[in-house]
């Protein structure tokens, strides 16, 4: 079914760093009918993945030709409200949810197949089965799907760069400056809700300790204490980006 669907979208939610998963998705995303939306907290990085989720979706508008026919999702809950809305509106013909939980959450109101297994094993097996498949056998309609998203990604980048160049001093500008100076060995913790959303507006380095956020049910609790606990067991730099209310709340 993966090879037959003209438009495939993979969505990665909250997930711990896993080089095997990133490597498998790197291979899978070589297929030109496949695009990967990887939120910052997914800790997934590939050459073509889209991590600046909200700004790319904003630049995409309401073009229905971008709707996926096959959606494959894994990881925890998404940060991006825009991505949730986009996928609920898209109504993909099939949605495979890779989730060890039972029953699996139907976040996008489109779940057709619950694959009750761990994401790491699934993606390694999936990439292995596709190893001998050649992209040229895909339907002509699907050839440009990934390319369409990459063009929008580039457009969104240029719009963002122009906006930030003219932006005055603000929390958004401060966030941009901070991201430029975070050491590579860092584990980055972002508090709810503004910091973790800002994180997905900027391209930034892949930090050795991963990117994390305590996504509590009531919003702002736990970010500071989570980062403090993490720093006790992590040998590198632990950095928390938070706001005054969130810091005081904890």
Q: Predicted regions: what is each one?
A:
Residues 1-4:
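Conformationally flexible catalytic loops at phosphate/diphosphate-handling active centers
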Residues 7-9, 70, 187, 237-239:
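Structural motif
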Residues 12-96, 104, 206-236, 248-250:
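Glycine-rich, anion-gripping cofactor-binding loops and their flanking helix/strand elements
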Residues 14-25, 76-79, 119, 123, ...:
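Generic structural signal for well-ordered, non-membrane alpha-helical segments
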Residues 19-20, 81-82, 106, 125, ...:
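Phosphate- and divalent-cation-binding pockets in alpha/beta enzyme and binding domains
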Residues 95-147:
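Terminal amphipathic helices with adjacent charged low-complexity linkers/tails
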Residues 150-236:
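Active-site diphosphate/adenylate-binding microenvironment
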Residues 243-244:
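Active-site glycine-centered loops adjacent to acidic/histidine catalytic or metal-binding residues
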């Amino acid at each position: 079914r993966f090879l037959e669907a003209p438009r495939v979208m993979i969505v990665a939610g909250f997930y711990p760093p896993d080089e095997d998963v990133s490597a498998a998705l790197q291979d899978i995303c070589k297929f030109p009918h496949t695009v990967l939306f990887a939120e910052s907290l997914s800790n997934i990085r590939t050459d073509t993945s889209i991590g600046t989720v909200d700004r790319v979706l904003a630049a995409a508008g309401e073009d229905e030709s971008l709707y996926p026919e096959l959606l494959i999702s894994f990881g925890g809950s998404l940060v991006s409200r825009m991505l949730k809305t986009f996928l609920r509106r898209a109504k993909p013909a099939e949605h495979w949810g890779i989730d060890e939980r039972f029953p699996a959450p139907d976040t996008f109101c489109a779940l057709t197949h619950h694959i009750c297994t761990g994401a790491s094993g699934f993606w390694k097996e999936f990439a292995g089965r596709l190893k001998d498949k050649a992209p040229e056998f895909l339907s002509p309609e699907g050839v440009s799907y990934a390319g369409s998203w990459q063009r929008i990604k580039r457009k969104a980048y240029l719009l963002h760069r122009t906006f930030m160049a003219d932006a005055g001093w603000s929390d958004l500008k401060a966030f941009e400056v901070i991201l430029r100076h975070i050491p590579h060995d860092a584990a980055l913790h972002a508090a709810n809700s503004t910091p973790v959303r800002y994180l997905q507006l900027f391209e930034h380095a892949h930090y050795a300790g991963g990117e994390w956020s305590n996504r509590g049910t009531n919003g702002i609790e736990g970010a500071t204490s989570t980062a403090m606990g993490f720093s006790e067991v992590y040998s590198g730099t632990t950095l928390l980006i938070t706001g005054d209310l969130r810091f005081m709340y904890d």
